[in-house]
């Protein structure tokens, strides 16, 4: 019998790639999503998951649901015998969180508390949580062996930090709980089929979707926020990870839960940092297009460099990021070329 796993927020970028990996690994995912970060396709199915079904030849059980809808969540848990939960659902734009802090705390914190309460009531005490490198605040590099930096500056990062603390407290209070908290660095790229990928609504918040939209002609030029950092070329250095590697990390995390692991925290990154200009050059190479850019003022709160120490994930999960920068950019460009309007243009 295939294990049923609840995936909250499973129609988004990382979620849809993880659902595909779950299916390929023999799990039976049940996905809930409220379409905040996803496109509605045919039959009220998220377009991303419709394409996952097409790629795998398997059906995905999906319910439109908001993480804040306690009654609907309770009903869902009564209907299914879940063995574990992978929790992606939440608001995720760092900049927007500064403008709308209460929204971020309500959705991310209250939504998670309600989910944990229902899990506890139903005896489902295995969780993989989608955390973020933003919990580190401003260390360079983020080591992952020590505690997070308490200098999270934005409500988004704080919400992830508070949830991590909450889950750790829960695991300490009740040893029947097992949780793996995955701190993501920056996912880029797309599935090699180019059928699913990152489809930001409106102006992309992240560097590489913006760069790829410049390459295909949807946007005029890239703004580079500062070229006077203490880095090799003066631009900010970050750790970029292929979304497929990141998705595979969740499969490794589910296996870890079976070991009665308590609460474990891992960085999912490559351990290598690339600057903004290095990323532009890599995308120019992959696309064969010149990517115009202009240097503008630094963004408040940006750090010079942030990259992962993923050694603990390698040691304890047997997980390593396998796909390099060239492959990330090639897959991203293929996705952008074949889906110039994103998932909105069904096909």
From Swiss-Prot:
Keywords: Carbohydrate metabolism, Galactose metabolism, Isomerase, NAD. The active site is at residue 156. It comes from the Eukaryota. Pathway: Carbohydrate metabolism; galactose metabolism. NAD(+) binds at residues 12-14, 33-37, 66-67, 88, 92, 160, 184. GO terms for cellular component: cytosol. InterPro entries: NAD(P)-bd_dom (IPR016040), NAD(P)-bd_dom_sf (IPR036291), UDP_G4E (IPR005886). It is an enzyme of class 5 (isomerase). The keyword Calcium does not apply. Its EC number is 5.1.3.2, 5.1.3.7. Substrate binds at residues 132-134, 184-186, 205-207, 223-225, 238, 299-302. It catalyses: UDP-alpha-D-glucose = UDP-alpha-D-galactose; UDP-N-acetyl-alpha-D-glucosamine = UDP-N-acetyl-alpha-D-galactosamine. Homodimer. This is UDP-glucose 4-epimerase. It comes from Rattus norvegicus (Rat). The lineage of its organism: Eukaryota, Metazoa, Chordata, Craniata, Vertebrata.
